[in-house]
């Protein structure tokens, strides 16, 4: 091909064979198709660093002090292509780090800074992330220098830390260990709106009723990190803004004091940009022309940078000295009355009445010119809201308390999605254990050995507890884990503590019976063991489930040993933040066939969502559901999906019978949630099932997987694969083993 073979119409010479442009995908044809692709993201083969690359090991070779020195030097090394405001990039870097971390939400643990996805769509092109592409490009020489030992995810947060330090406040600490991913995270639901910054009157709005925000969302509009700084839907009402702020920050794991500290502390630095018409701003990075080379929001307004920059449309600094940690934010917030006005870009802002010359901010270009400061409607809520106002007053009167509160809130903001402190790397990790890190006691005793494990398994199976109950409790304990923010899991045995012990899905009466029996076995063993050897309840819960799986397999004719590694410890009530665990209570769980009510999202979609949080592949999800159904580990001992006459045995009967062409399935009512499977010949009802069961025969991909496990030659493979996937779930939070 010489480039001269394109027809007069300019068509593609490959007839679209190698491009998606103009081609309808399966999802276009069938919008309701179950999205299993979220179970196969971020595979090792997609990592350009290689399948064996270990970021934690690479990070250990990093000279962290040298990196910080380079970052602090960068702050004042202004570049002509994107000059630093006031000669200091600190405000820009803080905003970049904040917006990297600020997508986190507690409901599903998704979002946050731990994977570096601000580099990719949609986040790299969100309206609220305007011009942060410049911040990352400014960091490229440092990333280039330190290479594989410093991820983008870590670098963005560390840059924010160094920005704060370079402007006069030593941060609380820094933990490295955020490994980059190499594609967008498609599992995150950002909202149903089909336009950026859609307001609450949009047809697909995230609000309903009296401004009730849809779960699991936290941000108020599509494309915003937190709230609209101009006020709800752009309405400049500080009291209404306070309500939005409280709800949004709570959904991002922040209480009222942390919210005030972050808002006031963050706005002590830098400025907002809106010194020109918004229609002068070019397209975001994902829509920009190829020659823009990844840059977006290129502006045709005058120079398009520095004084002339347009980002949010809001214009001005919050404080008289935007590159210094001080009490300037509260000084001016409480020192003046404020009046509503508009920026040159037309955004609502507030200006101080009769602003003193000394309280003006310098112009960003170093010309010596003085310009007015401003506040946003969200800032005014820090003064006018009946809860935020008194907190702000207290911080204003107690500068050291304010500084400490900001440092701690910033550390929480930037580390909330990293999991327990065991996941933190580097010399700057604070010694203090923080309640939001879900701390665990250290292992202070000798661990059980092979002979002890065998003896304990025998005691468990002789206790009178059923295989189903042992499997159910172990699964309930371990399956709280979320790969999104690395919370939950079996370590800590928090299933015996509030709130988990009272969760409906955990069947409190059954749970109490099992825990009482296991605690008796634990007490007897620990009292008799020599050499300081002990078994934790967390270990015993998992061991009990493993023993039950072995028995279920043996009863089905398969001798297997479920691998078990001791070393879990038991958390205390004092180490458990009940409120923060409340949001983790399952409202539906397809693995346990628990569905107390119908949701707007289908049962099968929620099953896949749960599997994704458990970091399972589609085959792993499939074999686990089939095995749990065969064992009978259903909520309430329900018969739904227990498609076997050998309940309690680890067989492939679920797959054989869900694919049985002699069975006709019919919904029991209009909800389409429960089904009866009748013999086609006699009409006799043989089985009942839920959508979480029938999907394994209905969905073409899951049916293909089910066929593998239903084959006559794969009954043993099904058992082996179940055991492997079971152990994976039991050890998801064993960061000490990784």
UniProtKB/Swiss-Prot annotation:
There is a cross-link at residues 226-252 (Tryptophyl-tyrosyl-methioninium (Tyr-Met) (with W-98)). PROSITE patterns: PEROXIDASE_2 (PS00436), PEROXIDASE_4 (PS50873). Its EC number is 1.11.1.21. Signal peptide: none annotated. It holds the Pfam family peroxidase. One of its GO terms (biological process) is hydrogen peroxide catabolic process. The active site is at residue 99. InterPro entries: Catalase_peroxidase, Haem_peroxidase, Haem_peroxidase_sf, Peroxidases_AS. One of its GO terms (cellular component) is cytosol. It catalyses: H2O2 + AH2 = A + 2 H2O; 2 H2O2 = O2 + 2 H2O. Keywords: Heme, Hydrogen peroxide, Iron, Metal-binding, Oxidoreductase, Peroxidase. Heme b binds at residue 267. Its cofactor is heme b. Residues 1-13 have a biased composition (Gly residues). GO terms for molecular function: catalase activity; heme binding; metal ion binding. Binds 1 heme b (iron(II)-protoporphyrin IX) group per dimer. Residues 1-26 are annotated as: Disordered. Formation of the three residue Trp-Tyr-Met cross-link is important for the catalase, but not the peroxidase activity of the enzyme. It is an enzyme of class 1 (oxidoreductase). The record marks 95 as: Transition state stabilizer. Homodimer or homotetramer. Belongs to the peroxidase family. Peroxidase/catalase subfamily. HAMAP family: Catal_peroxid. Bifunctional enzyme with both catalase and broad-spectrum peroxidase activity. This is Catalase-peroxidase.
């Amino acid at each position: 091909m010489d480039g001269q073979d394109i027809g007069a119409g300019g068509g593609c010479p490959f007839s679209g064979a190698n491009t998606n442009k103009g081609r309808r995908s399966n999802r276009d044809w069938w919008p309701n198709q179950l999205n299993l692709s979220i179970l196969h993201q971020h595979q090792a083969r997609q990592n350009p660093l290689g399948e064996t690359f270990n970021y934690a090991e690479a990070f250990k070779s990093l000279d962290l002090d040298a990196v910080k020195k380079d970052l602090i030097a960068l702050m004042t090394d202004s570049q002509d292509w994107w000059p630093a405001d006031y000669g200091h990039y600190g405000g820009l870097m803080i905003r970049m780090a904040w917006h990297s971390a600020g997508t986190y939400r507690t409901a599903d643990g998704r979002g946050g800074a731990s994977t570096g996805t601000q580099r990719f769509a949609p986040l790299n092109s969100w309206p609220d992330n305007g011009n942060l592409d410049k911040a990352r490009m400014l960091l490229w020489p440092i990333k280039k220098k330190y290479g594989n030992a410093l991820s983008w995810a870590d670098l963005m947060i560390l840059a924010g830390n160094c920005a704060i330090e370079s402007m006069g406040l030593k941060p609380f600490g820094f933990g490295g260990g955020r490994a980059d991913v190499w594609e967008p995270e498609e599992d995150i639901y950002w909202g149903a709106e089909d336009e950026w910054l859609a307001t609450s009157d949009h047809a697909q709005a995230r609000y309903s009723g009296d401004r009730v925000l849809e779960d699991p969302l936290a941000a108020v509009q599509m494309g915003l990190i937190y709230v609209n700084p101009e006020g709800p839907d752009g309405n400049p009402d500080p009291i209404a803004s306070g309500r939005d702020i409280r709800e949004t920050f709570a959904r991002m794991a922040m209480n009222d004091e942390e919210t005030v500290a972050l808002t006031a502390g963050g706005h002590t630095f830098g400025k907002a940009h809106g010194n020109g018409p918004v229609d002068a701003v070019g397209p975001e990075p994902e829509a920009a022309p190829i020659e823009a080379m990844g840059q977006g929001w290129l502006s045709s307004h005058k120079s398009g940078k520095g004084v002339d920059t347009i980002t949010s449309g809001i214009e001005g600094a919050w404080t008289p000295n935007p590159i210094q940690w001080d009490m300037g934010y509260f000084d001016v917030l409480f020192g003046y009355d404020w009046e509503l006005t508009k920026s040159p870009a037309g955004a609502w802002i507030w200006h101080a009445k009769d602003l003193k010359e000394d309280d003006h901010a310098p112009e960003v270009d170093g010309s010596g010119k003085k310009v007015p400061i401003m506040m946003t409607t969200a800032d005014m809520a820090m003064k006018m809201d009946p809860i935020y106002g008194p907190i702000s007053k207290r911080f204003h009167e107690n500068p050291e308390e304010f500084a400490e509160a900001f440092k701690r809130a910033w550390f929480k903001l930037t580390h909330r999605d990293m999991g327990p402190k065991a996941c933190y790397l580097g010399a700057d990790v604070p010694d203090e254990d923080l309640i939001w890190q879900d701390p665990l006691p250290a292992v202070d005793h000798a661990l059980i050995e092979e002979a002890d494990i065998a003896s304990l398994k025998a005691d468990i199976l002789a206790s009178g507890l059923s295989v189903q109950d042992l499997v159910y409790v172990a699964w309930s304990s371990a399956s709280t884990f979320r790969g999104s923010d690395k919370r939950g899991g079996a370590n800590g045995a928090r299933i015996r503590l509030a709130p988990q012990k009272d969760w409906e899905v955990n069947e409190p009466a059954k749970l109490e019976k099992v825990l009482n029996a296991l605690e008796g076995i634990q007490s007897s063993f620990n009292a008799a063991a020599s050499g300081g050897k002990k078994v934790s309840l967390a270990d015993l819960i998992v061991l009990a489930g493993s023993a039950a799986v072995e028995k279920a397999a043996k009863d089905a004719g398969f001798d297997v040993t479920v691998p078990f590694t001791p070393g879990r410890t038991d958390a205390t009530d004092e180490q458990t933040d009940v409120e923060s665990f409340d949001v983790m209570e399952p409202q539906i769980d397809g693995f346990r066939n628990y569905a107390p009510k119908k949701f707007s999202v289908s049962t099968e979609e929620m099953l896949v969502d749960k599997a994704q949080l458990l970091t399972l592949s589609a085959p792993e999800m499939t074999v686990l559901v089939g095995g749990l159904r065969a064992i009978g580990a259903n909520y309430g001992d329900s018969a739904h999906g227990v498609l076997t006459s050998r309940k309690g045995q680890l067989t492939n009967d679920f797959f054989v019978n869900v694919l049985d062409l002699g069975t006709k399935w019919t919904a029991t009512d209009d909800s389409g949630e429960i089904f009866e499977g009748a013999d086609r010949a006699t009409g006799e009802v043989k089985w009942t099932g839920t959508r979480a069961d029938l999907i394994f025969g209905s969905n073409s991909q899951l049916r293909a997987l089910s066929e593998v496990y239903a084959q006559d030659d794969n009954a043993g493979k099904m058992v082996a694969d179940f055991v492997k996937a079971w152990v994976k779930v039991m050890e998801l939070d064993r960061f000490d083993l990784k």
